[in-house]
């Protein structure tokens, strides 16, 4: 996948920016506040219909403006051209148009433009709460597997219905028969999600090991899935996992009714990262944590390429901060074999297949 043109109108500090990126590595450099990250975020909107810096569309409005517009023109590895337009206004919300057609469901666009991000804030995937790691899993798998996205949407819908019913049962205003129906549905969707997550972790690990060995000293990474309901998910078939969910929900039924809340499931699960058998969150240095996350993000490149037969667009914000020159050179060499890559930095840097673009202040 390649971006041929991106236009940002009244988007953050860009009143009207039009930019035609080069192939290979695009290094956007300039002082803090010049709008480098905003260019990456605009591309991210075209790919995933949202930003990666902020969760609120309104925060992307230029100061004093009531709407923003993003236009992107993309060409796939199979030479298929796509035009993507994102418009947001305070009055009418967000609208997504692809090749002239308005999309009523943003989820149907996910995966069309595979995208990988890195930003310093994403260190929370390593050292933050479980919700950050679940978000990492879901964002990656949803782009590569539309069935997973549908399972997630179905799971969330049934979970909301089940929680609402548990509250009604707590107040004794509903029959328990409907709870059995929703529990059966939830168990099946939960098993689909857990199995897809396990498959993803298994498939990404070889790439993670290879890249980590290039950017760091020889260290052995491992990722363990930690279920909120199942002691060990690894030895179970999908049918066995469905049955286990059924049994756990049956055991916890009275407690769930008393609390008015579903006890556990994929929405409460976690993953644990290890280096040389030591949990990274507890024992690794900040540099080791950063190298691990960078390697894991870069491993997504091979994962998406294999799954989608499409090279993903890479958006790496402030990638090189806190890295010494030798590691920067290694990363440049690795990224030179990728497709189109965007990196932000405060200073001009050189490397193989690098095109530098100066983003002056207040464009």
Swiss-Prot record:
Domain of life: Bacteria
Coiled coil feature spans: none
Amino-acid positions noted as binding ATP in the UniProt annotation, renumbered to this chain: 30-37
InterPro entries xrefs: DNA-binding_RecF, P-loop_NTPase, Rad50/SbcC_AAA, RecF_2
Keyword field: ATP-binding, Cytoplasm, DNA damage, DNA repair, DNA replication, DNA-binding, Nucleotide-binding, SOS response
GO terms classed as biological process: DNA replication; DNA synthesis involved in DNA repair; double-strand break repair; SOS response
GO molecular function: ATP binding; ATP hydrolysis activity; single-stranded DNA binding
PANTHER family from the UniProt entry: DNA REPLICATION AND REPAIR PROTEIN RECF (PTHR32182:SF0)
Family under the similarity heading: Belongs to the RecF family.
Protein name (database record): DNA replication and repair protein RecF
Organism: Chlorobium limicola (strain DSM 245 / NBRC 103803 / 6330)
């Amino acid at each position: 996948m390649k971006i041929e043109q991106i236009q940002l109108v009244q988007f953050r500090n860009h009143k009207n920016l039009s930019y035609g990126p080069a192939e290979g590595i695009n290094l956007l450099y300039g002082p803090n506040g010049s709008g480098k990250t905003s260019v990456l975020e605009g591309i991210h909107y075209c790919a995933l219909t949202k930003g990666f810096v902020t969760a609120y569309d309104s925060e992307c409005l230029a100061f004093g403006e009531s709407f923003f517009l993003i236009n992107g023109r993309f060409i796939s590895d199979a030479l298929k051209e796509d035009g993507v337009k994102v418009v947001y206004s305070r009055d009418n919300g967000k609208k997504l148009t692809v090749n002239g057609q308005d999309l009523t469901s943003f989820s149907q666009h996910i995966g069309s433009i595979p995208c990988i991000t890195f930003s310093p804030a994403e260190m929370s995937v390593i050292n933050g709460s479980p919700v950050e790691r679940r978000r990492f899993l879901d964002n990656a798998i949803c782009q590569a597997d539309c069935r997973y996205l549908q399972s997630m949407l179905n799971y969330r819908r049934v979970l909301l219905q089940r929680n609402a019913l548990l509250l009604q049962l707590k107040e004794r205003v509903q029959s328990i028969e409907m709870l059995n129906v929703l529990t059966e549905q939830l168990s099946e969707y939960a098993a689909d999600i857990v199995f897809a997550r396990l498959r993803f972790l298994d498939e990404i690990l070889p790439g993670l090991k290879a890249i980590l060995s290039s950017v760091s000293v020889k260290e052995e990474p491992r990722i363990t899935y930690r279920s909120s309901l199942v002691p060990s998910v690894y030895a179970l078939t999908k049918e066995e996992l469905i049955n286990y969910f059924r049994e756990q929900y049956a055991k916890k039924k009275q407690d769930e009714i008393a609390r008015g809340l579903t006890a556990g499931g994929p929405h409460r699960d976690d993953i644990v990262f290890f280096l040389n058998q030591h949990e990274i969150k507890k024992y690794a240095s900040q540099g080791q944590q950063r190298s691990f996350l960078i390697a894991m993000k870069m491993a997504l490149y091979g994962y998406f390429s294999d799954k989608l037969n499409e090279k993903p667009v890479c958006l790496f914000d402030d990638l090189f901060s806190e890295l010494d020159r030798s590691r920067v050179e290694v990363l440049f060499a690795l990224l030179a074999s990728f497709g189109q890559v965007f990196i932000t930095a405060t200073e001009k840097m050189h490397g193989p297949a690098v095109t530098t673009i100066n983003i002056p202040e207040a464009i």
